[in-house]
Structure formats: structure tokens, C-alpha cells
Amino acid sequence: PTAISELSDGLKENASHQTLLGVTGSGKTYTIAKVIEEVQKPTLVISHNKTLAAQLYGEFKNLFPNNAVEYFISYYDYYQPESYMPVTDTFIEKDFSMNEEIDRLRLKATSSLLQRKDVIVVSSVSCIYGLGNPNEWKKQVVHLKLDDSISRSSLTEYLVDIYYQRNDQVLERCNFRILGDIFEIFPAYEDKAIRVDIFDNIIQSIVSFDPLTGEEHSEHDEFYLYPARHFISDKD
């Protein structure tokens, strides 16, 4: 309790550095969780590797079931940089394998930071690098609201501008399709798709649904659709 109180007071007083000593494992996680609960601010938790980050992510998800606990690590399952071997005069091209689920979780982390205040992002130290201008990313968000006026062509253009691809056959992550007056969009950061019904250029309904079964889950008065990638720039 003393450590929790002192750490919380230090944060409220804008202390630049604080160190927690004498606690290991889950005890340290619990202590920091109580500090987060006391301070009530968005929090970034950094670990030194992916394995520990995954463990911390699971622990914080259990400790904060109603918060936006997010996971932000490198999405590469495998990465080989460009290289040159002078002995054999061989140039090796860059090669990599990207994990789609990790990419989804990374985008979900940044979208949560723009939507909510109760955010805890668990990351690895290797992810401390720039992702571009957050203001530019935020400006590209598409806001869909019931009874708002929008044409099919305008919504299509907005979606393409934020790197969603049209695919009228298969609805996959980062894709959308158009079925008459209905847009079905699979956000890059969600596990559910949304169905937007537009009639006479007016949004009639916004519904979340399972992209595999088509089962509808919840209706929305409004929905914020975030870009399908982090590196994004102004059209100008």
C-alpha cells in the first residue's frame, strides 16, 4: 500500500522518474495496476521482449476486464534485412513474414487511444519508433452517423483514401463491399464487420455483424472508422 500511494502521488506531482524495488513477478504487475486505477490516466507499459509483453497483456486484461487493454508489438513473425556477402558476391534481398492478427491489435491500440481514456497499452521496447504524425492519422478518420448525408461515391472515396480495398466477393480485414445501397466494411482493427445502409444519400442504419456467419450483433448510432495502416499522409 505504501508503494502504491507513493508512486501514485509521484505521478500526480509529475515526477519524471520513479523506481519500484523489492517486488517481483505478478506482485509488481498488481502494484502498477493499483497505481493505474488510482491515477486514472492512459498508460503505456513497456517490456523488454515480446514474451513478457504477452504475459503482461494477459495479466492486465484480467485485472482490467472493462478497460481498453491493448497490445502493441512488432508484427513481424520473421524478418531478414537486406545484406551483402562480399566473399561470394551475393546480395540477399529483404524478406519478412507479417502476422495479420498482431497488425490488427496494433491498429486497435491506436484507435482506442483516440476513442477512450481508460486505455492501457502493453508494448515491447523494440516498438519505440515513430509511426508518422498522429494528427494526420486522426484527420483521416471517417465518422459515420445515423441520419447524416453521404453519397455512395463519397463513402467509397473516403474508404479508398484510408487504404481500404473494395472486394465485392469476399469480405476480409481492410476490405469493403457494396451490395446495392448497403456497404459492408471490415475495419482493420476489429474482429466484427459493420453494415451501413444508405438510402437516398442518408445513413439509415449502422450494424456490427459476424463476417463469417452474417449474424448481426449490435446497432450503432455512430461509428468511427480508422485508417487501415499507421503510415499515412495528407493528400496535399
Predicted segment positions?
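ASCE RecA-like P-loop NTPase motor cores
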Residues: 1-236
